[in-house]
A protein has these predicted regions:
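Primarily membrane-embedded glycan-assembly and transfer machineries that use lipid-linked glycans
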Residues: 1-106, 130-170
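Membrane-interface alpha helices of multi-pass inner-membrane proteins
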Residues: 104-128
């Protein structure tokens, strides 16, 4: 019930999700559920790669493991049930975490995730604990840049989110 669970994402998150408003509720929910399935498969493939699987093995196994994960693990079943963005945020963070430390774009995907929904910002600790300073700085810089750009374009919505909605426990 959308009245029970209000939308409290930063303006950038609203922008990213706004194309779903082009569809009726049922179609938008189905699109989100399909996206969650794809994102879960990507997450599984990235985990497989980080465990040393070949890309072929990772992508051959990922869809089947993703189905199992979505059916058995509560965070995934809840994401599907509510058509939430949690798996997208996890996929963005996993792209950075699983990338080689030498990749210069490492941190961008996590920074975008943190600009969409604040929770993924905790992923900066992964880079800090690994002493991957460039990735941590890239993540923070990406998130701040996107958030500040959002503020410039949507100052009223940004102020409402950061000074009101973000602090409202309901």
């Amino acid at each position: 019930d959308y009245k029970m669970y209000p939308f409290t994402y930063p303006p950038f998150g609203a922008w990213v999700l706004s194309p779903l408003t082009w569809f009726d509720y049922e179609t938008a929910a189905r699109l989100m559920i399909m996206a969650i399935a794809l994102q879960t498969a990507v997450i599984v493939a990235l985990i497989g790669r980080s465990l040393g699987w070949s890309w072929g093995s990772a992508f051959a196994i990922a869809p089947w493991v993703a189905i199992l994960v979505q059916q058995c693990l509560e965070p995934f079943t809840q994401s599907v049930g509510f058509a939430q963005v949690n798996t997208a945020m996890m996929a963005l963070v996993m792209i950075d975490v699983a990338a080689p430390p030498s990749w210069k774009g490492r941190g961008v995907a996590s920074g975008l995730a943190a600009a969409i929904k604040l929770t993924p910002a905790i992923a900066v600790l992964i880079f800090l604990l690994r002493r991957q300073w460039r990735s941590a700085i890239t993540m923070v810089a990406t998130s701040l840049t996107v958030t500040l750009l959002s503020w410039v374009i949507s100052p009223g919505e940004s102020a409402r989110f950061f000074f009101d909605a973000m602090w409202d426990p309901q």
